[in-house]
């Protein structure tokens, strides 16, 4: 239950490119608009000489400051620097990423004249703080509890790292839930009045950076995930990348100049490509235009929908593979699917819709829920359920989710011995007995892996621990039990117990490689607080500066209007004071708030003597 005085629990869709926040209020979900009036907020954080910007403000200045504007943290979170996907993404990022301790990717930026380094969890935590602040401004109360969503195909380390980001942001993460499952709740509530009996629903969720497909059965408020598949590295940004590459080559052909090393030019081109991609979802042709793209050369090039489709056809077709896998895993024929639901901004692409519709033999796709907001909507419902706030309409909903990847340990010969199969409903617990492989073996190394391959070398290692103190005995005699326990966030605990001695050891699989330690998180929480107070200081400063500027211009205008009523000497004296303040403002852009306030007082006192004189005269 949420504690009193903590405000309602919110649902946050933490996206690769955009994030969205919702809350259950007055018996319905409210998707909350930010201070710009937008219901989704860019997952961008920018660092400048004077301030930190998050959301729209960060994305709006990206062309001016590409190397210090960080986005795509979700493509780094819970991954290793040496991951092939990280290496390929780095080619498209203007900001610097280098390997930190234990192969953890670290982001380097320049902030207030100093080089700073951040983990992906910290950048994501800044976006989470922004989403919380958007909700707090709307609700007028402080918020502590949240449900945060992740791609269904996120692995254990990516989930754990997302949870850590929530902790750094000062949130109590009630639950990590899968994005397609959250979207299914939005669909289920939308269809509740008209739905009778069991429905098999396929959620096709193609976002800015990740892709998930989940197949659920929905009956009487029970949402049971049968299977899930996907690609944690496929989305709208990959379609943008293809377009950017195409136009970089075209620019090279036409102008014999290579812009690939110019971060600002690439960013401006990318923004134009993103806009063109969106336009091509509703028209057959558009133009990509960027004035003075590189060395004063204007870039102007038409692009047709057909050309855009041709550039990305292999990626669009790739989207169909997880659909087939999902049907296979849930042992269902495509004719048994009642509804195919589109989620995520990239499902607006006509070709993606056409391929999906053709796969389902011309079946109408379900477009009744908002693809940008459905995930946050479902997260807000789940937040209301977990904090006991929802009405009877939602309190009887039950979510039965699954684990996306098989989990097991390495046994002799590097074999993967699976304890929990993929698509097992969570929470889940499974025990299995093992024995020693060498005579008088005193301890056993237990290595935990996730993946579907027969050899552990081809799977992903999650962590390892040692069970020691096994009494000397011939091999095959000692018996020890390994227990896998997955909680409702999809996070794994593994324990082992020696039968004879009762000795135990356990590990929460948190990917020791690259996982933030308790101390790291504590330090980051404190830094987040520090950045927050710096942001507030900066805001105060800007308000004081604007206040002084407005005051100087306003009294200047009033002075001109008064014209002849004032003696020339007084008028001149005051005009000089205003001129001096305006000059001072130009020279002291970075002054502190109290300096602006002090100048304001000086100007006010000069003005009040003049006014007094005038009325006495």
Swiss-Prot record:
Keywords attached to this entry: ATP-binding, Chaperone, Nucleotide-binding, Stress response
GO molecular-function terms, A-Z: ATP binding; ATP-dependent protein folding chaperone
GO BP: any one term: response to heat
PROSITE patterns, alphabetized: HSP70_1, HSP70_2, HSP70_3
InterPro entries hit by this protein: ATPase_NBD (IPR043129), Heat_shock_70_CS (IPR018181), HSP70_C_sf (IPR029048), HSP70_peptide-bd_sf (IPR029047), Hsp_70_fam (IPR013126)
CDD domains documented for this protein: ASKHA_NBD_HSP70_HSPA1
Name of the protein this chain belongs to: Heat shock 70 kDa protein 18
Species lineage: Eukaryota, Viridiplantae, Streptophyta, Embryophyta, Tracheophyta
């Amino acid at each position: 239950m949420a504690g009193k005085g903590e405000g309602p629990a919110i649902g946050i869709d933490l996206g690769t490119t955009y994030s969205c926040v919702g809350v259950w209020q007055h018996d319905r979900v409210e998707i909350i608009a930010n201070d710009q009036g937008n219901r989704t907020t860019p997952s961008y954080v920018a660092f400048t000489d004077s301030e930190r910007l998050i959301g729209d403000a960060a994305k709006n200045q990206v062309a001016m400051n590409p190397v210090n504007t960080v986005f795509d943290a979700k493509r780094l979170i819970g991954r290793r620097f040496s991951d092939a996907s990280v290496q390929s993404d780095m080619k498209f990022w203007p900001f610097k990423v280098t390997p930190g301790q234990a192969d953890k990717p670290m982001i380097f930026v320049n902030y207030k004249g100093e080089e700073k380094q951040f983990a992906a969890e910290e950048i994501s935590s800044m976006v989470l703080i922004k989403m919380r602040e958007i909700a707090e401004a709307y609700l007028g109360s402080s918020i502590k509890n949240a449900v945060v969503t992740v791609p269904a195909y996120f692995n254990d380390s990516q989930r754990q790292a997302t949870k850590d980001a929530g902790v750094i942001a000062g949130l109590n993460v009630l639950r990590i839930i899968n994005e397609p499952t959250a979207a299914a709740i939005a669909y289920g509530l939308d269809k509740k009045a008209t739905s009778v009996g069991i429905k098999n629903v396929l959620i096709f969720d193609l976002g800015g950076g990740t892709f998930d497909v989940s197949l659920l059965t929905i009956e009487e408020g029970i949402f049971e995930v049968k299977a899930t598949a996907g690609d944690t590295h496929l989305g709208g940004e990959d379609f943008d990348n293809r377009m950017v590459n195409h136009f970089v080559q075209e620019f090279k052909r036409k102008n014999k100049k290579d812009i690939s090393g110019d971060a600002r030019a690439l960013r401006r081109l990318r923004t134009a490509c993103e806009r063109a991609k969106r336009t091509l979802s509703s028209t057959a042709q558009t133009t990509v235009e960027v004035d003075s793209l590189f060395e004063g050369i204007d870039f102007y090039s038409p692009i047709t929908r057909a050309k855009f489709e041709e550039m990305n056809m292999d990626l669009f077709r790739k989207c169909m593979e997880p659909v087939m896998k999902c049907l296979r895993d849930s042992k269902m024929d495509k004719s048994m699917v009642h509804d195919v639901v589109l989620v995520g901004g990239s499902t607006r692409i006509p070709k993606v819709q056409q391929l999906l519709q053709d796969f389902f033999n011309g079946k109408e796709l379900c477009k009744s829920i908002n693809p940008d907001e459905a995930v946050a909507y479902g997260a807000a419902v789940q937040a209301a359920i977990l904090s006991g706030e929802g009405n009877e309409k939602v309190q009887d909903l039950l979510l039965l989710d699954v684990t996306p990847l098989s989990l097991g340990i390495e046994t002799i010969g590097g074999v993967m011995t699976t304890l929990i199969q993929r698509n097992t409903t969570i929470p889940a617990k499974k025990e299995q007995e093992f024995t020693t492989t060498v005579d008088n073996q005193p301890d056993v190394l237990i290595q935990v892996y996730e993946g579907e391959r027969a050899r552990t070398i081809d799977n992903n290692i999650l962590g390892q621990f040692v069970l020691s103190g096994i009494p000397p005995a011939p091999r095959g005699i000692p018996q020890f039990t390994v227990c896998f326990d997955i909680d409702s966030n999809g996070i794994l605990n593994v324990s082992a117990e020696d039968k004879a001695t009762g000795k135990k050891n356990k590990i929460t699989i948190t990917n020791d490689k690259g996982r933030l330690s308790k101390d790291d998180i504590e330090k980051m929480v404190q830094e987040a607080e520090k950045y927050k107070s710096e942001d507030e200081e900066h805001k105060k400063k800007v308000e004081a500066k604007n206040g002084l500027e407005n005051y100087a211009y306003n009294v200047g205008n009033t002075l001109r209007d008064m014209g002849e009523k004032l003696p020339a000497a007084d008028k001149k004296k005051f005009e000089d004071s205003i001129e001096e303040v305006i000059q001072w403002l130009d020279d002291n852009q970075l002054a502190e708030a109290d300096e602006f306030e002090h100048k304001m007082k000086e100007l006010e006192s000069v003005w009040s003597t003049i006014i007094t004189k005038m009325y006495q005269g």
